[in-house]
Amino acid sequence: MSNGTIVQCIGAVVDIQFPRDNMPKIYEALTLVDEGSSFAEKGLTLEVQQQLGDGVVRTIALGSSDGLRRGMQVAGTGAPISVPVGHGTLGRIMDVLGRPIDEAGPIASDEKRAIHQPAPRFDELSPSVELLETGIKVIDLVCPFAKGGKVGLFGGAGVGKTVNMMELINNIAKQHSGLSVFAGVGERTREGNDFYHEMEESNVLDKVAMVFGQMNEPPGNRLRVALTGLTMAEKFRDEGRDILFFVDNIYRYTLAGTEVSALLGRMPSAVGYQPTLAEEMGVLQERITSTKTGSITSIQAVYVPADDLTDPSPATTFQHLDSTVVLSRDIAALGIYPAVDPLDSSSRQLDPQVVGEEHYQVARGVQQTLQRYKELRDIIAILGMDELSPEDKQAVARARKIQRFLSQPFYVAEVFTGSPGKYVSLAETIRGFKMIVDGECDALPEQAFYMVGTIDEAFEKAKKLQ
């Protein structure tokens, strides 16, 4: 292991001169040994990104570069960033380097793994068609999740990605007796704090490992924190377990890559993103997969800049997912939560051979009715309901009931809404929507379907409204 000297600092990018015959490899971790400034973070870790030649390497600082100056000494570690893995990580909050940030002492783990790992080989993969029930009607009906699959929650600012993610954690992680890993990538510290207390109150903290790289941290931390969380999840998977891996938010991972790319002097591509966008996304997503030994079911929140799904970042994420749950601002504006768009959301599992003929027909019937209502909306706005044919009037009435029945009170939002959360089984969800589509609820007022769980609750609410 050789020592080097800092020759240039530009923000998070630091150039270091090493002896020509002993340069560190790409992705090797380096540590600051010279504490020549009271500002500089002790033992600051830097990751090699480029070899510029003549003994100079370009690195990204995984921490604040405040207080760094030319001439400071840096030592090579001879290995990539390695983080603790295994049972010692459960119930703990760690940073990108696997250091504890919950003030609960050191992490009791004997094994460390490098955060850069190859994706499983093609012959090791194991596709799954087993459904994962979430208890959220709109998701179970229109875009069902597969165990060991990848799910994306797409939405702009403030339409409920994190609340939906928390509800899924509440419904799946608490029911699912397995282990979970949560990677907070560039999100608000407050949300990480809320998540920790939520897990603590529900007594599942000892089954969750948490890794956070928040908004206020340098781009190097935000770029690598998803890999840190994934490395911990992979260890559990390789032990033969079924793991839940939550990432909030994949867009911030891309954004950190954009910041790093610009600092490294690469030419930007479309909309200012890094030219390696597809490759960086692929490196992460190809590792989030299920093998013959165990499975990783991943649920990822994806911020959609300016509500534009064609933006390169969400568009690149789409192709890696099995289910896409699209949250719509228009639906949120109607006061319908979860604000999932049933016409935009899709799933590979929505196939009669996987979900069964009845589920498939009911889901398609719901989508057809809503699509017809969408087509008629302009006519209604101009001419009013009276100009519609009886069939269209009936379709509109049913669509409005379906739209309201797709809403549901959440457990995690009880404190805000005052109404208790509801978990609806898949069988109840199918039965309820089948009754509406078949016209068995035509006599009920549409208000009866708003914010209820099962169809029986809608009938009870209708009696109270009369």
Swiss-Prot record:
GO cellular component terms attached to this protein's record: plasma membrane; proton-transporting ATP synthase complex
Signal peptide: none
UniProt-listed SUPFAM superfamilies: C-terminal domain of alpha and beta subunits of F1 ATP synthase, N-terminal domain of alpha and beta subunits of F1 ATP synthase, P-loop containing nucleoside triphosphate hydrolases
Catalytic activity: ATP + H2O + 4 H(+)(in) = ADP + phosphate + 5 H(+)(out)
Keyword Metal-binding set for record: no
Enzyme nomenclature, EC number: 7.1.2.2
Database matches in PROSITE patterns: ATPASE_ALPHA_BETA
Coiled-coil segments: none
GO molecular function: ATP binding; ATP hydrolysis activity; proton-transporting ATP synthase activity, rotational mechanism
Keyword field: ATP synthesis, ATP-binding, Cell inner membrane, Cell membrane, CF(1), Hydrogen ion transport, Ion transport, Membrane, Nucleotide-binding, Translocase, Transport
A family per Pfam: ATP-synt_ab
Binding site for ATP: 155-162
Superkingdom, taxonomy of origin: Bacteria
Recorded topology in the membrane: Peripheral membrane protein
SMART domains tied to this protein: AAA
Cell compartment(s), UniProt: Cell inner membrane
Keyword Nucleotidyltransferase belongs to the record: no
Similarity remark: Belongs to the ATPase alpha/beta chains family.
Function: Produces ATP from ADP in the presence of a proton gradient across the membrane. The catalytic sites are hosted primarily by the beta subunits.
Subunit structure: F-type ATPases have 2 components, CF(1) - the catalytic core - and CF(0) - the membrane proton channel. CF(1) has five subunits: alpha(3), beta(3), gamma(1), delta(1), epsilon(1). CF(0) has three main subunits: a(1), b(2) and c(9-12). The alpha and beta chains form an alternating ring which encloses part of the gamma chain. CF(1) is attached to CF(0) by a central stalk formed by the gamma and epsilon chains, while a peripheral stalk is formed by the delta and b chains.
Entry-linked PANTHER family: ATP SYNTHASE, ATP SYNTHASE SUBUNIT BETA, MITOCHONDRIAL
Protein name (record): ATP synthase subunit beta
